[in-house]
């Protein structure tokens, strides 16, 4: 295999369910190791925490009570040395709806 045909791929996984993100990351790493390519990761990135504070009483009258809603976004980063064969196998992995994937050629 020539050097031009071999590239690095950076895979970013993110989602609201940390268990699903971890499972997909584990499947990608297992697949890459099984195919014999070099893998770095999964690297856990900081969890993003989105908080929304809303007033309970819509009219503005009465006690000042508030609800707090929170959404946590877990992220993982995986770098693999991938050929076309490996990328085709990556497309066959089942990904839950709660996990989003970004691929970037480096």
UniProtKB/Swiss-Prot annotation:
Protein family membership: Belongs to the universal ribosomal protein uS10 family.
Gene Ontology MF annotations: structural constituent of ribosome; tRNA binding
Role played: Involved in the binding of tRNA to the ribosomes.
Complex and partners: Part of the 30S ribosomal subunit.
Keywords: Ribonucleoprotein, Ribosomal protein
Keyword Thylakoid: no
Protein name: Small ribosomal subunit protein uS10
Keyword Ribonucleoprotein among record annotations: yes
A single cellular component GO annotation: small ribosomal subunit
Residue pairs linked by disulfide bridges in the UniProt entry: none
Native source organism of the sequence: Pyrobaculum islandicum (strain DSM 4184 / JCM 9189 / GEO3)
GO terms classed as biological process: translation
């Amino acid at each position: 295999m020539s050097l031009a045909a071999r590239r690095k791929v950076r895979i970013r996984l993110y989602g609201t369910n940390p268990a699903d993100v971890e499972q997909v990351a584990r499947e990608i790493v297992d697949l890459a190791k099984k195919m014999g390519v070099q893998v770095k990761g999964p690297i856990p990135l900081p969890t993003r925490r989105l908080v929304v504070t809303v007033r309970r009483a819509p009219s503005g009258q009465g006690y000042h009570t508030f609800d707090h809603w929170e959404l946590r976004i877990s992220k993982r980063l995986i770098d693999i040395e991938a050929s076309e064969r490996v990328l085709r196998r990556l497309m066959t992995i089942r990904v839950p709806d709660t996990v989003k994937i970004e691929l970037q050629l480096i």
